[in-house]
């Protein structure tokens, strides 16, 4: 008989893992929590070793905390490459976007990929412009999908014994809607996704408002992926 196991006790990342309930409340795309959680991976040069850790908001946003920690603990030659992957429960605000760009400009050997569970105050034009500026400066920003949730569950979560495969499987529709809105942001289109908080809890509901400019600019397969658009629509 094989025993059920959680993360190995010999796993050097175990002390940096978050609890399963934390992952669920932070990364559920339907939740509108104020706090932000960051799970991150760092890979140096040609090394195959990946260093993982996590962080949360303090008096500063978690992105700023990461930058301060990274720059204070690491000194490396500009010729050494470093790839960083973030899994954020909220996308960066405009001020954090600016701080990230400054950090990357001072460390040209660093590449950054950001996966986000939700878009932070995406109706705010400053936040939208901040994300566009990040993309234009070479940062990859994507909405977390099922594969990213599973990756985070396995590598960042102190899941219960036997629950490796029982990671939270959130409704794909929310991921697709956020991905659609992220396309609108990157393409400088008006917002199409409106989100409201349900009364007396954190869960949210959405309304989709598409204009002609959305149909004319966004690739049809992205619109159809939401399942809310009829394929007989004339796109262009």
Curated annotation (Swiss-Prot):
Keywords: Cytoplasm, Hydrolase, Metal-binding, mRNA processing, Nucleus, Zinc. Residues 10-134 form the CMP/dCMP-type deaminase domain. GO terms for biological process: cytidine to uridine editing; mRNA processing; positive regulation of gene expression via chromosomal CpG island demethylation. The active site is at residue 63. Coiled coil: none annotated. One of its GO terms (molecular function) is cytidine deaminase activity. Binds 1 Zn(2+) ion per subunit. It catalyses: a cytidine in mRNA + H2O + H(+) = a uridine in mRNA + NH4(+); cytidine(6666) in apoB mRNA + H2O + H(+) = uridine(6666) in apoB mRNA + NH4(+). It is found in: Cytoplasm; Nucleus. Its main location: cytoplasm. Belongs to the cytidine and deoxycytidylate deaminase family. Homodimer. Interacts with A1CF; form an mRNA editing complex. Interacts with RBM47; form an mRNA editing complex. Found in a complex with CELF2/CUGBP2 and A1CF. Interacts with HNRPAB. Interacts with SYNCRIP. This is C->U-editing enzyme APOBEC-1.
């Amino acid at each position: 008989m094989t025993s059920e196991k959680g993360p190995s006790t010999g796993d050097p990342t175990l002390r940096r893992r978050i609890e399963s309930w934390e992952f669920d409340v932070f990364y559920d795309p339907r939740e509108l929590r104020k706090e932000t959680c960051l799970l991150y991976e760092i890979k140096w040069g040609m090394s195959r070793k990946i260093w993982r850790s996590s962080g949360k908001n303090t008096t500063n946003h978690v992105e700023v905390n990461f930058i301060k920690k990274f720059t204070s603990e690491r000194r490396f030659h500009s010729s050494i490459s470093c790839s960083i992957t973030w899994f954020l429960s909220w996308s960066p605000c405009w001020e954090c976007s600016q701080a990230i760009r400054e950090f990357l400009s001072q460390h040209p050997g660093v590449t950054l990929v950001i996966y986000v569970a939700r878009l932070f105050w995406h109706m705010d034009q400053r936040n939208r412009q901040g994300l566009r500026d990040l993309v234009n400066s070479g940062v990859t920003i994507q909405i977390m999908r099922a594969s990213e949730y599973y990756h985070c569950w396995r590598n960042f979560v102190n899941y219960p014994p036997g629950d490796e495969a029982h990671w939270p499987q959130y409704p794909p529709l929310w991921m697709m809607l956020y991905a659609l809105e992220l396309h609108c942001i990157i393409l400088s289109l008006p917002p199409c996704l409106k989100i409201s908080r349900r009364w007396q809890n954190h869960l949210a509901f959405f309304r989709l408002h598409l204009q002609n400019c959305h149909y004319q600019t966004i690739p049809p397969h992205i619109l159809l992926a939401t399942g809310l658009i009829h394929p007989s629509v004339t796109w262009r």
